[in-house]
């Protein structure tokens, strides 16, 4: 019934198995990839023809993690998987980026890649396995795809590169880098690092590319026996149309791209576009030689050519800059004085308002992943409203791009944050992009660094980021520092580098062509370092290190530790005690399972009141000490006094006064304030208190009378 094919290799010390022919046979391509005991299913379906009027390539990559893969049931009311998690969105983008450039230009058939994590061994991260499975499924599908693609994770542990480290090994690694590419080219890099040098980062990229070559060989072997017949696809030949358009529009386009101001340049380009459209699509002609979609596509291609030629020929950019100059920078802090920390970062026509907010443990984000529930105390949210580019558009929940840009900035800042022990706050940073003309994610990195320092968060060092581009034609190439939005899509490699003066904390690369050598990447990274250091210098004019104290409106947090066996007493039955402390003191209280207590409030008095209250609950009273207490109950045999936090003790009727007492209520009543001395504990651990040995007026202990009956000594 099944015609199955399988290839198995040893990869980084673990077996990798690729299978096809048994599962999802109605898809164009389907591969079940097993690495260790992590199992991922990837499927590909591509429409047989494009939709009428389709003018772009509608590729969708959906990565999904099923909770059954880790033997879990989803949380929440409905008990089934819902909208994609942040991690699922990020992995979908991670897979999309290296495969998208490998579809031929002009292919516009609706294509969907669905990758499902079926089983997770809690050792091997499924994202790289998913990338390999998707590449294999595409290669087998018959869809025009110039793959296969390989992918690998690289760690850096004790000065050595490690291929596909286990999940627990990543805790020791100073690098988390994922690289993807073909046999002869790197296509994508995504990474977080702890201030590593450009040389180490580049070495990791090269190490990773060599590391995934066996995977590409395995996919090719599987394709040789299991691939479907390639679909016939001939891209349209628009060379004649392009040459004709070039003769009409080249001069005007070159003039337009010498205009340095964005709005004026766009207006000039639109005028050229209208002229071209009028020439090739004259009014009144029923059957023109070319469609509007063809005209628009070729014009866009022509724009890119002219900009690239101009940069390579003149070493001059669209806005008049040379290749290495960074746009003018203005950095400000304290923009919103009632927030905990704020900054305005402007670089040319790209601008971000970034606001930092400090919270307590109860503000931490709970993340339910396949590896288990964990808490995240640093959140960075990036917002890109349509007004930032002078357009109207959808407003609502963040899209994939916003989530991806926010995570890129998160990776850049995260290595420089203090530990929870050093700074016990939850941090949320929001970046509002108010203007955009290229590199808004790197503006977010710079603005976040400024806002956190303004908030008094003790960053190890300031962090800055820069977006770079590269254009290559034959043996000529040009590396562009701080690219514009118009330059973003024209290059053969665009990459973003963030870090401190000492090293890189985040690197993201997307390479669209083969032939980008290690030497070219080294030149590009060195140029990026110079740009990053320049930006750090401009940022230092606003603030160069974290403020010594928190902002006026930020909460203060005091940390204290209590014995684990006392946690129950502080919380109380059904949370009664801790609710009372919070209500009466006004402070926020968070208690961890290890006995760490975080008390937060904008008022020092509220923190101190809560701290004393908790201390009174968990501390043990000392025998021989005098305490002030309150009578909470009277009985024939004595009075019960609350004298130490929530602790009560009995004052026996014989200990109420020095003279004989006939009735307890003759001496005390409920609610009376009294002074008591802790005499000790009985054999059952019950507290023994005495009032008669304490002067009830002063609270001082009365010295024992002399044996001869004389007056008490002073």
Curated annotation (Swiss-Prot):
Name any Gene Ontology BP term. RNA processing
Q: KH domain: which residues?
A: 555-614
Which protein family is named in the record? Belongs to the polyribonucleotide nucleotidyltransferase family.
Could you confirm whether the keyword Chloroplast appears in this record?
no
* Record field: catalytic activity: RNA(n+1) + phosphate = RNA(n) + a ribonucleoside 5'-diphosphate
Q: By its UniProt entry, which SUPFAM superfamilies does this protein fall under?
A: Eukaryotic type KH-domain (KH-domain type I), Nucleic acid-binding proteins, Ribonuclease PH domain 2-like, Ribosomal protein S5 domain 2-like
Q: According to the UniProt record, what class of enzyme is this?
A: transferase
Its main subcellular localisation, reduced to a broad class, is cytoplasm
Entry protein name: Polyribonucleotide nucleotidyltransferase
Q: What is an example of a GO molecular function annotated in this UniProt entry?
A: RNA binding
InterPro entries in UniProt: ExoRNase_PH_dom1 (IPR001247), ExoRNase_PH_dom2 (IPR015847), ExoRNase_PH_dom2_sf (IPR036345), KH_dom (IPR004087), KH_dom_type_1 (IPR004088), KH_dom_type_1_sf (IPR036612), NA-bd_OB-fold (IPR012340), PNPase (IPR012162)
What does the protein in this record do? Involved in mRNA degradation. Catalyzes the phosphorolysis of single-stranded polyribonucleotides processively in the 3'- to 5'-direction.
Enzyme Commission number, as recorded:
2.7.7.8
Q: Which UniProt keywords apply?
A: Cytoplasm, Magnesium, Metal-binding, Nucleotidyltransferase, RNA-binding, Transferase
Residues reported in the UniProt entry to bind Mg(2+): 488, 494
Q: Which domain of life is it from?
A: Bacteria
Where in or outside the cell? Cytoplasm
Task: Look up the record and report any one GO term of the cellular component aspect.
Answer: cytosol
Per its UniProt record, the required cofactor names are: Mg(2+)
Q: Which organism is it from?
A: Sinorhizobium medicae (strain WSM419)
Residue ranges occupied by any S1 motif domain in the UniProt entry? 624-692
